[in-house]
């Protein structure tokens, strides 16, 4: 007995973790600065931590009330009906739910390149396929409606990442509206706003009252600091009211995750602090790194260093973990997550020294 042929399914490549690098290099994890996964360097809200502790004795019970409470809270936050909010285990869980709701076998999605590999992974898991539109370095990774429409050929789902990972560029509101009014009736625009809290651009969720072909993804992993709990959600058109119950995984969002997310929503001060810190860090990175960078509205900065693998490996040996963007098709670039002031300044010092010493690829 063997699994089906999975040769067309490329595995997801995450940023390297502190424990992984520490074991490999024989270092103390406490001596490492991890800026590879766009996590919140300030951690979760203290209110979320307290909620996790309070919820711990209840983990023997399937989550129902907490899931409902979180759904209703998010619906109220965004001015939607509860049926329009699909809570999921991370934003990637929402990607799966939307794929199940939309794709028939052999349907295609259109996704950005470079971009989040799970868009196409989910499509292929569900017997669909993927084609790409290029967010080009030659154009400073600018995102426009024309860029997408030039590649569009009636795909059932079109993914738009704003802010875009790993570049930090945004799709302006007027460009999104143009897309919503230009694609065919059967096409769903999926706007991935995992990094939306860090951007100035308004959320696509505001458009759901006007357009029935737009859905938006959000997560608690970034600005809210709950990456380890895997909790996110999609906001979908009102006409989709009964679809969630038919496509979601039973009890996929845990009781602890839902309670922590509810508490995190109550701590706006922590989110504001996290966003302000990220904006300071990305400005500092762009101003002080001795290498080309691009304007970013995420909690990270893309940096051109010549040989990303060499720079990444050298930085690790000096205790700074950053993301080699070779897996994004950018072997000359690294992505540096926004850290605390101390972490950011350490990263700049280490990277500037390494970039001056590592030969250009």
From Swiss-Prot:
Catalyzed reactions: L-histidinol phosphate + 2-oxoglutarate = 3-(imidazol-4-yl)-2-oxopropyl phosphate + L-glutamate
EC nos: 2.6.1.9
Residues carrying N6-(pyridoxal phosphate)lysine: 222
GO molecular function: histidinol-phosphate transaminase activity; pyridoxal phosphate binding
Keywords from the UniProt entry: Amino-acid biosynthesis, Aminotransferase, Histidine biosynthesis, Pyridoxal phosphate, Transferase
Enzyme class: transferase
Pathway: Amino-acid biosynthesis; L-histidine biosynthesis; L-histidine from 5-phospho-alpha-D-ribose 1-diphosphate: step 7/9
Keyword Amino-acid biosynthesis: yes
GO biological process: L-histidine biosynthetic process
UniProt cross-references to Gene3D superfamilies, sorted A to Z: Aspartate Aminotransferase, domain 1, Type I PLP-dependent aspartate aminotransferase-like (Major domain)
Region ranges (Disordered): 26-45
InterPro entries the UniProt entry points to: Aminotrans_II_pyridoxalP_BS (IPR001917), Aminotransferase_I/II_large (IPR004839), HisP_aminotrans (IPR005861), HistidinolP_aminotransfase (IPR050106), PyrdxlP-dep_Trfase (IPR015424), PyrdxlP-dep_Trfase_major (IPR015421), PyrdxlP-dep_Trfase_small (IPR015422)
CDD domains hit by this protein: AAT_like
Cofactor(s) needed for function: pyridoxal 5'-phosphate
Residues spanning the signal sequence: none
Superkingdom classification of source: Archaea
Keyword flag Membrane: no
Record-linked NCBIfam families: hisC
Similarity section: Belongs to the class-II pyridoxal-phosphate-dependent aminotransferase family. Histidinol-phosphate aminotransferase subfamily.
Descriptive protein name: Histidinol-phosphate aminotransferase
């Amino acid at each position: 007995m063997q699994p089906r042929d999975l040769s067309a399914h490329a595995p997801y490549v995450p940023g390297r973790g502190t424990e992984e690098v520490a074991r490999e290099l024989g270092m103390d994890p406490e001596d490492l600065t991890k800026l590879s996964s766009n996590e919140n360097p300030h951690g979760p809200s203290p209110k979320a931590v307290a909620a996790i502790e309070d919820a711990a004795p209840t983990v023997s019970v399937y989550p129902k009330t907490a899931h409902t409470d979180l759904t209703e809270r998010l619906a109220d936050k965004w001015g939607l009906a509860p049926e329009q909010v699909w809570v999921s285990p991370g934003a990637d869980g929402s990607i799966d739910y939307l794929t199940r709701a939309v794709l028939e076998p052999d349907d295609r999605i259109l996704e950005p390149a470079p971009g989040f590999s799970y868009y196409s992974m989910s499509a292929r898991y569900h017997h669909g396929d993927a084609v790409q539109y290029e967010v080009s370095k030659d154009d400073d990774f600018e995102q426009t409606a024309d860029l997408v429409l030039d590649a569009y050929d009636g795909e059932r789902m079109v993914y738009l990442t704003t802010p875009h990972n790993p570049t930090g560029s945004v799709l302006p509101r007027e460009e999104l509206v143009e897309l919503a009014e230009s694609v065919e009736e059967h096409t769903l625009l999926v706007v991935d706003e995992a990094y939306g809290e860090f951007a100035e651009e308004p959320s696509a969720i505001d458009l759901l009252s006007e357009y029935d072909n737009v859905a938006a993804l959000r997560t608690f992993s970034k600005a809210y600091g709950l990456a380890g709990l895997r909790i996110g959600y999609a906001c979908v058109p009102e006409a989709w009211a009964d679809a969630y119950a038919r496509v979601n995984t039973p009890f996929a969002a845990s009781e602890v995750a839902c309670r922590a997310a509810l508490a995190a929503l109550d701590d706006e001060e922590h989110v504001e602090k996290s966003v302000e810190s990220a904006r300071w860090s990305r400005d500092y990175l762009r101003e002080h790194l001795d290498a080309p960078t691009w304007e970013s509205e995420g909690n990270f900065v893309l940096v051109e260093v010549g040989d990303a693998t060499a720079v990444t490996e050298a930085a690790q040996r000096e205790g700074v973990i950053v993301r080699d963007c070779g897996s994004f098709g950018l072997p000359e670039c690294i992505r540096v997550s926004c850290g605390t002031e101390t972490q950011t300044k350490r990263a700049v010092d280490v990277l500037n020294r390494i970039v001056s010493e590592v030969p250009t690829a």
